[in-house]
């Protein structure tokens, strides 16, 4: 008998700190939950705001369910389940997602769960239910030895990209294996051990799946524009006959254990700055102490007056950023504090500063006003997480998985709002003060003297990558297996439902007397407002000998106002549960704000004060310079940053400011004075080149009333933005190489100067690119380099134009020992793309690009981007209908014309950042002559 729970969840968020007398809006999350006879929990949530549905399958299995010697299996299945199932066939959900206009088809693995999620047009709901059922009941037979061998390589590439080939990548591994005992489920990393993964047999993998991927260990959530009664019928049809698995025994709660404090150090090949991390074992997810621990970490590091920031940043000037978080999982939790210090800073000094900050907190505790502001921010964050059907679906799935109750949100919020100052001090005393901890010192190579005194060396077994050492496999082999029986023919894909009508938001426009253009969309899905003011110019109006001025100007405008110190400004925003920030880009400076609708006027008043009444604080200016230099030093150690910066110079030329880092260079930042920032502000921050965009639960009249004073208070000035001409594509291809000794991956950037956003060919070229490298798993680059060869974790191609011409770029990180082979395969794909493009490719592209319009404007962020496209490029409010016509009228001949014109492999820049010792000479075989080495390695990196 199916069990059924119907709940209308009503949550009232009452926060006493709110400065307005308005009643806090009442949040309603309506859901219905049923449990099938086989144990599958299914949760339904109705949201009619857009004709889309989020589908999420969450299995209650993560790395914590693995055993020593067989790690990485949970994460491996996150990959495998997208590849094939008996009835969807090869390509599985990825191919279907492209056909039906799905968005965000993805998965993730944690210590405790694995989820599979995406948003689709509402007419594809039955197809998705059919596909999700195939994952649980008709999948595992399709996993064969060649499939497993290939996916092992993909996962290895993911680890190289996220761990081995990045600064501080091994830090968490060292922490967790010392924080948790050897037999603890959190002793190893989610991605697992490469050795365990390589040793995994097909039988090991199938045994793991059959134990954990069962209905009684899973939750299915359908959230969005659904007919619940019809959806129930489909759920029963496709899921009922999947057999129930064996009973799952819950893991017992088991905190980490540190018998005595331990200090370890590691000389990191990629680090340029020393990093100190300190970790304490704490409480698990939803434990009564976890809420106060969240507040503790937020208070200690958030804002100018936070104890760690006051001492480590302002007083001692040892760093520009302190990060602290309470990380709670199902079995245990940990409090983690990280400080990336300035160049050549001894971490003993940092630790002394940390101890001083703890002493200050112990003496003063957390003031009520700070507790109130943190709760206000939590309220805004809660609403933000519910701004999409996928966000709501994930919350419902998580609550059900961990508590058995999708409505646990009620208790969750109540516990959050019930935290007192006393609770915060209690958890500090219980988990932090005088308690044993793990400390790691990650220092640059040959920088052992910067580590904590007495630290012992952490031993990391690093992978050796040798040419030709990887296991061979043939991904083209068709799997042969016995089909799993069913009561009906599951190979027949369900039909579409009624065609949904895309809801294009209504856009309003206005203009102030000072030239400020205003664009808005009213949307009352959640009681939030998001807005930004985009001021044209950005880096483009800098001088070449003062690179970084725009970035520093934007940063300094956040640091107080004429009548408010930094602390007072931060406090005023925080009490509203709002945010206001400035950022600089290549073509503009952007002011962004997010607030509860009831606090919009108060929030905007603060943002206007930041914009019109800068404080120009000299002390803050010097701190920001140090932060920029610190970030630049760290970029020097990041292969991805190195690759992108070097590639930009090859695309645009060294004399074009578009080729330069927005942060500037270490030399240029050192030369900048506060007068340079004031000059930039006086000359370029003008409403004559600005546009304001507003989205949310607010009317046009309220917005215009809120900014009418800007006509008088923000005077227009004439601003001339220099024109930098983008070079033409090269006449022939050249290979460029940037040496990163001992790199486990090579960063590839292949491309050429291309189109501006407003060029007539820009959008058609993007349509052409969908099947090449813009369509994720539907693209040929992904299918051949990742799925076919296992060379990479990810690869994409894109056109990136602004008001001036941009570039076409293929980007990827590939296993070091296949740098040449990956490049040759990309060259071959490009050479044959136009010629081999067929009706099936065209149908796939059209199907996705048209059907995906149903969810093009679902989120507030998407609506803001729509307004920015309209204001920045002069597009019509219904420009999506014009684009839809372009897609519908696209032909194979037009695709071939665009491919021949814009993605010619013989007229491109082929850039590689990797290990020159093993890969440079091999690149001659690509056929574009002798590679050009762009740098000489100054310091050999240890083996």
List each model region and its residues.
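Bacterial N-terminal signal peptides that target proteins for export
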Residues: 1-6
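A common structural junction motif
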Residues: 133-143, 238-246, 355-366, 610-616, ...
